[in-house]
């Protein structure tokens, strides 16, 4: 690949009603009666088992607004959850989590029900691996995740003209031994124009700080589909390093039993590193990782024009399982 070798408002009640009216009546239990699967900013995700009258139905993952949110943030998260429901309902792709319902629970909180097949987030798997072996995921697994994520992003970008806006390991769910790989949490997605650019002046790129590209950190940065590609590259980096981008803990020569103190965190270095490509310890990765490293590097080029599109990543990865030959001009 050229360049790859060189890398050293409507009324809220009305809005809610319009979404809920198209959803059949669903009885969502109160939070204490469901198993908690995880949580995010302002929301929690629960397992809802559905077996009425002795019938067996597939379970759902139910995302609910946290009851602990104050009124201001509750309004923000309610809008975000409503937006996510409206977007998710119109998506249909094997690498995007499926919509099931949007309604209110018995405690009055808004709920988004999604498909659930026993998945864990990629972030959970990274944390588990860090505690167990501490070794990177096999290169073949990383490339499999890359292909399935790229297919989901290609669908969002090309067919739905949507920027996901918050790609990271926490927003990828995995079933079993990487049998299925799906992107979730489309609540901060932004519309793309025909040039794959976010042009809506009211649109605000949310993202999550360590995964943000340089253009999203600039005051007048132009956001395109390549913002997702940058965060996608950092997600592959997470699988190779088992770390959060740019959040550097003490050096390896520090006593393993030593407690990490918040005062040890270098704020200045962290903020200076945001939007850049984090380094990789090449001594920990053998030759089998070369393709994954190349893909990570080209996706995290600072200039968005030098990153491949999701469609081109898919094309390259599907060609005999190879990812060499990626051009940075797509």
Curated annotation (Swiss-Prot):
Task: Write the gene name.
Answer: Pbk
Positions of post-translational Phosphoserine modification? 31, 58
Originating organism: Mus musculus (Mouse)
Q: Kindly provide the name given to this protein in its UniProt entry.
A: Lymphokine-activated killer T-cell-originated protein kinase
Amino-acid positions noted as binding ATP in the UniProt annotation, renumbered to this chain: 37-45, 63
| InterPro entries in alphabetical order | Kinase-like_dom_sf (IPR011009), PKc_TOPK (IPR041989), Prot_kinase_dom (IPR000719), Ser/Thr_kinase_AS (IPR008271)
Glycyl lysine isopeptide (Lys-Gly) (interchain with G-Cter in SUMO2) cross-link located where? 168
Instruction: State the function annotated in the UniProt record.
Output: Phosphorylates MAP kinase p38. Seems to be active only in mitosis. May also play a role in the activation of lymphoid cells. When phosphorylated, forms a complex with TP53, leading to TP53 destabilization.
Q: Which family does it belong to?
A: Belongs to the protein kinase superfamily. STE Ser/Thr protein kinase family. MAP kinase kinase subfamily.
> What is the regulation of this protein's activity?
Activated by phosphorylation.
This protein's GO cellular component annotations are:
nucleus
């Amino acid at each position: 690949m050229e360049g790859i070798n060189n890398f050293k408002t409507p009324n809220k009640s009305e809005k809610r009603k319009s979404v809920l009216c198209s959803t059949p009546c669903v009885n969502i239990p109160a939070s204490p009666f469901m198993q908690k699967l995880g949580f995010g900013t302002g929301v929690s995700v629960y397992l809802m088992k559905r077996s009425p009258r002795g019938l067996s139905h597939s379970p759902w993952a139910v995302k609910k607004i946290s009851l602990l949110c104050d009124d201001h943030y509750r309004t923000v998260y309610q809008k975000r959850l409503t937006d996510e429901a409206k977007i998710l309902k119109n998506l249909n792709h094997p690498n995007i989590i499926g919509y099931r319902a949007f309604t209110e629970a018995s405690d009055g909180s808004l709920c988004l029900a999604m498909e659930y097949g026993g998945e864990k987030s990629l972030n959970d798997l990274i944390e588990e691996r860090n505690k167990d072996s501490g070794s990177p995921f096999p290169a073949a697994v990383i490339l499999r995740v890359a292909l399935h994520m790229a297919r989901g992003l290609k669908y969002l970008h090309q067919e739905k003209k949507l920027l996901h806006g918050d790609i990271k390991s926490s927003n990828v769910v995995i079933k079993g031994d990487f049998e299925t790989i799906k992107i979730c949490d489309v609540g901060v997605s932004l519309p793309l124009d025909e040039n794959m650019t976010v042009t809506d002046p009211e649109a605000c790129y949310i993202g999550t700080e360590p995964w943000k590209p340089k253009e999203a950190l600039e005051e007048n940065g132009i956001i395109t589909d390549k913002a997702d590609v940058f965060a996608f590259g950092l997600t592959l980096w997470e699988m190779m390093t088992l770390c959060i981008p740019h959040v550097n803990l003490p050096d390896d020569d520090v006593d393993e039993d030593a407690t990490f103190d918040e005062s040890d965190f270098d704020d200045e270095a962290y903020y200076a590193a945001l939007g850049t490509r984090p380094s990789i310890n090449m001594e920990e990765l053998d030759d089998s990782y070369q393709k994954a490293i190349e893909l990570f590097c080209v996706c995290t080029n600072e200039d968005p024009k030098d990153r491949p599109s999701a469609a081109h990543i898919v094309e390259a990865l599907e060609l005999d399982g190879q990812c060499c030959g990626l051009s940075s001009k797509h």
